[in-house]
């Protein structure tokens, strides 16, 4: 969007038509409210940016089908020129006509027709240039079908529009209706407006509405519309004095038959504008972040660099986009409904005043005044920015231009920098409501994203702090590594040819996050359908599973006007976190995933694991929807956003920790209940504190050795070829180097049945060497777990017999032979190392042996005794022998 500059923000309101409550659609579901339909169609208007159009910003849905639209606004309009009752100069008229046509032409390219063109909807900015307002009303209301008022103003309606009359469906079923108005109807409206400017007065003021409409239709019988209009209003002398170019323009605009009337595009190329058109440079839309065109192609610096600062004033807020300013206005306490109430646009009516005077038994009423609130109030209320500016008065100018090369730039400088630093430690929900904090975060992320992928590392770094909601969609795309010509790729996919999956998609979409107004709109359903179908068609080796729609929902919501980016994000997300989950036969993938999850529960919470296993409440009964949809099926979108902000910073094993964190929030209830109660508990999942869940997930992840979550069906490591601009550091709370190469010390794949038989996870020899700090190998260092403490990070328990232990063992390990480790009651045999094992309870304990069955049984015994963080060395002591790291105790003399 363009910067706010000298413009203002305005709001206007109207009601959508109410639908009967007892009528269902053809699919058997309740009818979608018209306000929801309008809200969905409105979204595309936010993407239409042009210097001659007022930028649409937002739409808000209120009670009783009320809608409030926020858009760019200017106080002056052509209405003000007409109030002066003086003819406007011909040169000005031609410039106004050309600028209006520029706006109309651009709208038409996007399939939009104004239909409500009038002097008060043609605004003038501070420099006197034209901006068309309310140009999307006809589009968003489905050509007027979804509202109880006509779109347009009688004096300016084209004859063909009047001839069609007002069409209103009453049976809520498809029926034949007239074709919508085309671009040529706006040309007629422009002709009437230009005529009024030329003569300095408004037309048809002495006629009532029905007479105006009749008069306009009778123009079909005259030879010269222009002369008849001039004679009717007593201004023939003024018209005759106009230059030939202006007369020619008016005649072309006021051609009665639309087939002979030019379109805005044709009219702009007409010779009447031969002197005006060279004064304007054609508008080129700036390249977006993920476009195939070169973003810096039109970036040129002036010869005199000081010219850049010439027009700089102290109003830095005006340099931000109108979308950002509106977002901050809302955070600073802006209330749309309150603004409209203050201007008496919204008026409350006592309920007793709405009662009818007379009522029949069949419900027919009489004597009830017409409710005029359903009609259009055309007033636009200017939204005051005083409260926002007052809130940001202490923010220095340097905060609007952070230095990206500065190490301290993660919190931009301002007069209240200490407050910002303090704000960064506050709970996320408070930070997201802090106006000054969000301003700084939005500006910083905006700058970083404009430098993507060059600034990819810094985006990762800043995302660890938090992601501003306004920038979440693009930030997620950057974290997922989306690059390239995503629009060309998406457009090349066939989304129209019927495929067998279509029926299932049609069934799933009306059940997917339909509490959300945007996703429940028909426009949202259509976008869902296209994105899901594009994914299915472009991945022939995978299939559509129920749950894919839920997975798509966050990406579609954040990129509602950019289906290509939603598709690209989804296509990058699934291989990373759900590799091969959508195979036709995915049972082996899911079973391995659930087994590893079960081991993670035992690793972090053995007491809970023991209880769930005893009652037979296995992950297969509750966790498949969690992981197949990455929790989007069980949490609402606002919780998913905060959860995925962190998920996208971790690797493919982080979801295990989220799952364990959810169970730990329900821990007391799970431990106190049996199988049936647990089933009921998960059928309607209780409220989960997402911020706590994220915090605990990170803590669990830090305690988990990177190889403990190894899966043979995970995404294979990608070859490391990222020499510049890529992310070279590990995921932030991860002990994992990104995609480490497989070595002899890595974990080996084992059959699924063997994996299921083991309660505790295995860790690789790499992890053991790294965590024991037995050698200094840069490849295996874990940056997030470094500590200055000399205390060991884990305890190695060697369960071989004492003779084997003496021949060579891991430095610092203790020996508890398996054969004599436990009593008949399952308790640990008291020995010299029992106390040490007890002291290490709560830290990572690695069981090492040379018989896999024995190590698994020993680990299972410790889990039964509620020892957390128990794991097994994959491959046993034999994996360590080739490294030369085994030590032999000095002989005692």
Swiss-Prot record:
The protein kinase domain is predicted to be catalytically inactive. Changing residue 503 to I: In a colorectal adenocarcinoma sample; somatic mutation. Signal peptide: none annotated. Residues 720-729 have a biased composition (Low complexity). It is linked to Hypotonia, infantile, with psychomotor retardation and characteristic facies 3: An autosomal recessive neurodevelopmental disorder characterized by profound developmental disability, intellectual disability and severe hypotonia. Many patients have seizures, and show brain atrophy, dysgenesis of the corpus callosum and white-matter changes on neuroimaging. Non-specific facial dysmorphism is noted in some individuals. Residues 790-889 form the Rhodanese domain. One of its GO terms (cellular component) is cytoplasm. Component of the FERRY complex composed of five subunits, TBCK, PPP1R21, FERRY3, CRYZL1 and GATD1 with a ratio of 1:2:1:2:4, respectively. Residues 466-651 form the Rab-GAP TBC domain. Residues 1-273 form the Protein kinase domain. One of its GO terms (biological process) is regulation of TOR signaling. This is TBC domain-containing protein kinase-like protein. Keywords: Cytoplasm, Cytoskeleton, Disease variant, Endosome. GO terms for molecular function: ATP binding; GTPase activator activity; protein kinase activity. It comes from the Eukaryota. Gene3D superfamilies: putative rabgap domain of human tbc1 domain family member 14 like domains (1.10.8.270), Rhodanese-like domain (3.40.250.10), Transferase(Phosphotransferase) domain 1 (1.10.510.10), Ypt/Rab-GAP domain of gyp1p, domain 3 (1.10.472.80). Belongs to the protein kinase superfamily. It comes from Homo sapiens. InterPro entries: Kinase-like_dom_sf, Prot_kinase_dom, Rab-GAP-TBC_dom, Rab-GAP_TBC_sf, Rhodanese-like_dom, Rhodanese-like_dom_sf. Residues 710-749 are annotated as: Disordered. It is found in: Cytoplasm; Cytoplasm, Cytoskeleton, Spindle; Midbody; Early endosome. Component of the FERRY complex (Five-subunit Endosomal Rab5 and RNA/ribosome intermediary). The FERRY complex directly interacts with mRNAs and RAB5A, and functions as a RAB5A effector involved in the localization and the distribution of specific mRNAs most likely by mediating their endosomal transport. The complex recruits mRNAs and ribosomes to early endosomes through direct mRNA-interaction. Also involved in the modulation of mTOR signaling and expression of mTOR complex components. Involved in the control of actin-cytoskeleton organization.
